[in-house]
């Protein structure tokens, strides 16, 4: 997926910012969250998040669901590198395994469980 954040900010800027954030907040991880193309869910009011490393993916789902005002019966799926992460994983684990060279973790969200549909 093409992330708008990457389009808006050159790599060097993102990397410098990511390094600065990691130094200043070593117990938190910088995450970029954007809606997947063709997803039929609302847009987020912001796309950059600084989340505690020990927050689980499941807890992060809850936060994002709240921000986009999803009803309990509405589906929401996260994709990290085109894969749905386990809800029991911590954001810190997910970050360590999937962060990009600019020190950000990129997460796409959708109402479909198949990426890009």
Curated annotation (Swiss-Prot):
Propeptide residues per the UniProt entry? 117
Question: What membrane topology does the annotation report for this chain?
Answer: Lipid-anchor
- Post-translational note: The precursor molecule is cleaved by ATG4 (ATG4A, ATG4B, ATG4C or ATG4D) to expose the glycine at the C-terminus and form the cytosolic form, GABARAPL1-I. The processed form is then activated by APG7L/ATG7, transferred to ATG3 and conjugated to phosphatidylethanolamine (PE) phospholipid to form the membrane-bound form, GABARAPL1-II. During non-canonical autophagy, the processed form is conjugated to phosphatidylserine (PS) phospholipid. ATG4 proteins also mediate the delipidation of PE-conjugated forms required for GABARAPL1 recycling when autophagosomes fuse with lysosomes.
Pfam families recorded for this chain? ATG8 (PF02991)
Note the site residues: Cleavage: 116-117
Give GO cellular component annotations, separated by semicolons.
Answer: autophagosome; cytoplasmic vesicle membrane; endoplasmic reticulum; Golgi apparatus; microtubule
Give me the residues lipidated as Phosphatidylserine amidated glycine: 116
- Primary location group: cytoplasm
Q: Which SUPFAM superfamilies match?
A: Ubiquitin-like (SSF54236)
Keywords from the named record: Autophagy, Cytoplasm, Cytoplasmic vesicle, Cytoskeleton, Endoplasmic reticulum, Golgi apparatus, Lipoprotein, Membrane, Microtubule
| GO BP | autophagy
Q: Where is the lipid attached (Phosphatidylethanolamine amidated glycine)?
A: 116
The subunit structure is: Interacts with ATG13, OPRK1, RB1CC1 and ULK1. Interacts with TP53INP1 and TP53INP2. Directly interacts with SQSTM1. Interacts with ATG3, ATG7 and MAP15. Interacts with TECPR2. Interacts with TBC1D5. Interacts with MAPK15. Interacts with TRIM5. Interacts with MEFV and TRIM21. Interacts with WDFY3. Interacts with the reticulophagy receptor TEX264. Interacts with UBA5. Interacts with KBTBD6 and KBTBD7; the interaction is direct. Interacts with reticulophagy regulators RETREG1, RETREG2 and RETREG3. Interacts with IRGM. Interacts with DNM2. Interacts with NCOA4 (via C-terminus).
* Annotated function: Ubiquitin-like modifier that increases cell-surface expression of kappa-type opioid receptor through facilitating anterograde intracellular trafficking of the receptor. Involved in formation of autophagosomal vacuoles. While LC3s are involved in elongation of the phagophore membrane, the GABARAP/GATE-16 subfamily is essential for a later stage in autophagosome maturation.
Q: Which family does it belong to?
A: Belongs to the ATG8 family.
What name does the UniProt record give this protein?
Gamma-aminobutyric acid receptor-associated protein-like 1
């Amino acid at each position: 997926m093409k992330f708008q954040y990457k389009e808006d900010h050159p790599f060097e800027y993102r990397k410098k910012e990511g390094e600065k954030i990691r130094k200043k907040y070593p117990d938190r991880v910088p995450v970029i969250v954007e809606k997947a193309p063709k997803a039929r869910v609302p847009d987020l009011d912001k796309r950059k998040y600084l989340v505690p490393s020990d927050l689980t993916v499941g807890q992060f789902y809850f936060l994002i669901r709240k921000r986009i005002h999803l009803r309990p019966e509405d589906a929401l799926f996260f994709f990290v590198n085109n894969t749905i992460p386990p809800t029991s994983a911590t954001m810190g684990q997910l970050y360590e395994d999937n962060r990009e060279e600019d020190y950000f973790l990129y997460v796409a969200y959708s109402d479909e469980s198949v990426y890009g549909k």
